[in-house]
């Protein structure tokens, strides 16, 4: 009986990788503050906050969602003139109603405040 239980446990771990059970992906901290912004917001009074921010990102010009995994979203925002690509990540923790946002430029030392403006715009659409 123990062998059967162990076999079932091993098989289920092969069929369902541990990442499929993750409900929250922790966003990396900002290493270079000059071109990265990371914030966490309590979204207690907002119905379906992840869906709301996802819809806004889908409708943002020059921004393309490249990955969605449960309550995690990764998008790429391309600048209008120089075509620089910034990474925008959103992760939602439903148990505590915390929405984590991270926006970072891929190149350069600074971003002329673009990432902070992007995060501020998202926040204004949420609240």
Q: Language-model features: where?
A:
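Bacterial N-terminal signal peptides
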Residues: 6-15
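Positively charged n-region of N-terminal signal peptides that target proteins for export
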Residues: 1-5
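Ser/Thr-rich, low-complexity intrinsically disordered terminal regions
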Residues: 17-127
């Amino acid at each position: 009986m123990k062998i059967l239980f162990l076999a079932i446990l091993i098989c289920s771990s092969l069929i369902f990788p541990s990442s499929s059970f993750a409900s929250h992906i922790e966003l990396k901290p900002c290493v270079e503050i000059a071109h990265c912004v990371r914030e966490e917001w309590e979204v207690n009074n907002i119905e379906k906050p992840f869906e709301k921010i996802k819809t806004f990102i889908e409708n943002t010009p020059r921004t393309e969602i490249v990955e969605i995994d449960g309550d995690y979203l990764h998008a790429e925002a391309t600048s209008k003139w120089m075509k620089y690509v910034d990474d925008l990540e959103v992760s939602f923790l439903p148990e505590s109603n915390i929405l984590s946002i991270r926006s970072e430029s891929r190149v350069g030392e600074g971003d002329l405040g673009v990432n902070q403006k992007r995060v501020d715009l998202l926040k204004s659409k949420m609240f």
